[in-house]
Amino acid sequence: MKKVLNIFTIALIIIFAIISCQEGSDSSSSASYSNKVIKVGFAGDSDYQIWNPIVSNLAKEGITVELVTFADYTIPNQALNDGEIDLNAFQHYAYFNDEVSNKGYKLTAIANTYISAMNIYSKKIKSVSEVKKGDKVAIPNDPTNGGRALKVLEAAGLIKVKPEAGDTPSVSDIIENPLNLDIITVDAGGIYSLLPDVACAVINGNYAIDFGLNPGSDYIFKDDPAIYSGNSFVNLIAARTKDKDNELYKKVVAAYQSETVEEIYANNFKGSYLPTWK
């Protein structure tokens, strides 16, 4: 009997030792994360609704994420390239590829997030059929969002652009402008403020939400992803190329590509954001 008790005691010691090692491993894993703050940049304020729950969930794993918001689209890629932030999540592939190609940034897309509607909005008219000759129309001034806006205007029947210009035509690619519209190009984040002064404007989904517009109902013309080719306007998470396989960043991606975020898309963004990782 004594021998049996000794064997039982030894077995318990081994079991507790294994459990202790596992707990120590988990603790050391969390500790290894605690010294690293992952800075994630994005443009506008609407994406806080997405990222705040992600930050909370990652904190439970001992991973600290700091959110950094930028006033416009021209800064987050430079900030990422310069090491001021670790990841950014604000742009689609067309914009990202243009920035990398033209500015030489050493950045890589590490995950897909969503595609966002880019609708036409107005404070003066209820339909694009009410646009008159010589009216002013505002679009973003960067090449990719401006190009996308022109495709939306084309889909609305207001202009026609050269087919060979693809998904990102420029104003010079307009081949038909029957109403002789005055197309004004301004920073994407500043377009909403021009709505009282123009007939209509093409506004990015995140900025529309930031300024209280409902992308599911407030438009006078609704964007249709079918008019674009490939993944040009799918949004992404980017990292510096040298860090594209970083294990911590993979955990951030996993936390983003989750049912929690899908529910936020559906409930908070009124159908404007559609997940693209499935």
Predicted ranges, named:
Residues 1-37:
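Short, low-complexity disordered leader/linker segments with a strong preference
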Residues 24-39, 58-60, 128-135:
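Immediate post-signal peptide segment of exported/extracytoplasmic ligand-binding proteins
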Residues 37, 41-68, 75, 79:
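Short, polar/charged alpha-helical segment
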Residues 67-78, 166-193:
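Short helix-initiation/N-cap motifs at beta->coil->alpha
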Residues 98-110, 124-125, 197, 202, ...:
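Ligand-binding "clamshell"
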Residues 110-159, 262:
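A conserved helix-loop-strand patch within extracytoplasmic ligand-binding domains
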Residues 117-128, 232-246:
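A bilobed periplasmic-binding-protein/Venus flytrap-type ligand-binding module shared by bacterial periplasmic
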Residues 145-154, 256-276:
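Periplasmic-binding protein-like
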